Curated annotation (Swiss-Prot):
Residues 1-22 form the signal peptide. This is Uncharacterized lipoprotein MPN_097. Keywords: Cell membrane, Lipoprotein, Membrane, Palmitate, Signal. It is found in: Cell membrane. Residues 480-490 have a biased composition (Basic and acidic residues).
Length: 541
């Protein structure tokens, strides 16, 4: 298990790789020469699959007359599905439908090597690739000889993205007054809580001064350009609130002040506590190391206890934490790798004589000690509710760009999702309900002729005048199968006869809404639509 994820993470930073299967000793077999090269792909993204198809089509048009054409074989289940499929085909010696190349992580080469089916990319020109992008081949165990068995073709890395307005509020709340020797300054805020001025200092080194200047600038821009509008709904009425952007008449430092006021509404007031930002010196280099980043995040969480550290349950509209992670394996393994001075000899395993050596994982080994240090750092952060771990299906930035995180680490492939543009809007219910991110997100479709006709009599019989804003479709959750229901009942009743199985064989609850279209209106809801059922009235504020 350690080998699987250890290899996966570092190849993940390099990108996906091509692995070739060949004919050939232990468990070898010859594949049928069908006059084409089969490329297996388990990409789940439609856009990525479409891009790959375009590349293959282009190659097939320009290839040499005697060169084999490439044919894509689609495998379900993502990269794990591709791994399982390859292992199965190798074990049964599939000579006819087995593919020749696969897009996956390079530890699959070890699976091929156990059967003598690995094939080096001898003769392939890799001059345009940095040697550093090929070094992972040196850490593949079980191969017959050192060579390039996998080549990166799609590159991404994990990046740290800061929310400048949130950071400005955090740091500005915690720092000393400029030129003031007083330790604390108290004032009454709107919610009658005591606002405490902190004792934190901001470093004077060049990097820190530049970062603080950038943070101040971005906070000022946020205060000038952004405001959150809220709309009070009538009792028992389900309306939506739009978070919109509107111009503010603020200038100079007032922009940052306006930004802080808005951020405070979400993050609450600063607390001067031991182990927090009290007497702390903030420097830009906290973002250079995992230990520094996690330690700073823990201090921030403790300093905003009313909204972060003391909160046991969170809604989708609440502060989710200080640091957000899209991939916990990536974060864990890279932080352990960094703790070992970025030396593979200090990592979970090392390749020795062509085999994976796990001696580092002994209790007194370097990897064990490094993991223990990293674990203790993360434990302090999780104990203070400062860590947000993405459940999957979306990007952490879904929270961060609405100021619910101070910063996050995610794939560079999702960089574009980290920013809220001028037209970015989020729907928020005012009756204490909400759309939980990231498990439930919907695309809103712009109104067209068909949607306007379906949008009600008011739209079809008169000019629309922009009343219909758009539509989205509700999809019912997948219902349990009879087998799954039976397993659940058996577990709950521990061998006793179930009192009843009313849902077995019946239509799944919620399926009446499957494919149901919800219409969003700006000024009024047509007579043939029902508010909160198939229509929602939205107003900007």
């Amino acid at each position: 298990m350690q080998f699987k994820y250890g290899a996966l993470i570092f190849s993940g930073f390099l990108g996906l790789s091509i692995v070739l299967a060949s004919c050939g000793a232990r468990g070898k077999f010859d594949q049928v020469d069908d006059g084409k090269i089969k490329l297996a792909s388990s990409l789940t993204s439609r856009s990525a699959s479409a891009a790959l198809q375009k590349v293959v089509e282009k190659y097939n048009k320009v290839k040499g007359v005697n060169d084999y054409p490439i044919e894509i074989t689609q495998i379900a289940g993502g990269y794990d599905g591709g791994r399982t499929d390859l292992q199965t085909r190798v074990s049964v010696k599939d000579k006819t439908s087995f593919y020749n190349m696969i897009l996956n992580y390079p530890d699959l080469v070890s699976v091929l090597a156990r059967n003598g089916m690995e094939l080096p990319f001898d003769g392939v020109n890799v001059d345009k690739l940095s040697p550093n992008f090929l070094k992972f081949n040196e850490r593949i165990s079980g191969v017959a000889k050192k060579a390039n068995y996998a080549i990166p073709i799609s590159m991404s890395t994990d990046i740290l993205i800061l929310n400048a307005p949130v950071l400005h509020y955090i740091l500005n709340s915690a720092k000393k007054n400029d030129g003031n020797t007083k330790v604390q300054v108290k004032a009454q805020s709107k919610d009658s809580q005591t606002k405490v001025k902190g004792t934190m200092e901001i470093g004077t080194d060049e990097s820190t001064k530049n970062l603080w200047s950038d943070i101040q600038k971005k906070a000022g821009e946020n205060g000038k350009a952004t405001t959150e509008g809220t709309k009070k709904a009538a009792a028992k009425s389900t309306h939506l609130t739009l978070l919109t952007k509107s111009e503010q008449s603020t200038q100079g430092n007032n922009g940052a002040s306006e930004s802080d006021k808005k951020i405070e509404e979400t993050w609450g007031t600063y607390s001067e506590v031991d182990g927090g930002l009290k007497n702390y010196t903030f420097k830009a280099d906290v973002f250079d190391t995992w230990h520094g980043l996690i330690d700073f995040s823990t201090r921030v969480a403790k300093s905003f206890k009313n909204k972060v550290s003391d909160i046991s349950t969170k809604k989708g509209t609440d502060i989710q934490g200080v640091l957000g992670l899209d991939s916990t394996p990536n974060a864990l393994f890279t932080s352990v790798f960094a703790a070992g001075d970025s030396n593979f000899d200090n990592f979970f395993y090392k390749v020795k004589d062509g085999r994976a050596d796990f001696s580092n994982f002994n209790e007194n080994g370097t990897s064990y000690k490094n993991l223990e240090k990293v674990f203790n750092d993360y434990k302090k952060l999780t104990d203070s509710n400062g860590l947000f771990v993405n459940k999957g299906g979306s990007y952490t930035s879904n929270f961060q760009k609405f100021h619910q995180l101070a910063y996050s680490i995610s794939s560079s492939s999702g960089y574009a999702y980290a920013f809220a543009g001028e037209n970015s809007k989020r729907l928020k219910f005012n009756d204490d309900t909400f759309i939980e991110y990231p498990s439930f997100t919907q695309e809103i479709h712009a109104p067209g002729q068909s949607s306007q006709k379906e949008g009600g009599q008011q739209q079809s019989n008169s000019k629309d005048n922009g009343n219909l804003l758009g539509t989205f479709t509700i999809e019912a959750a997948k219902s349990k199968t009879k087998t799954e229901v039976k397993k659940t009942e058996d577990t709950q009743n521990q061998g006793k006869k179930a009192e009843g199985t009313p849902n077995q064989g019946k239509k799944a609850e919620g399926t009446e809404n499957q494919g149901k279209t919800i219409f969003l209106y700006k000024t009024s809801i047509p007579n043939d639509k029902q508010d909160g059922v198939d229509a929602v009235l939205i107003k900007d504020k």
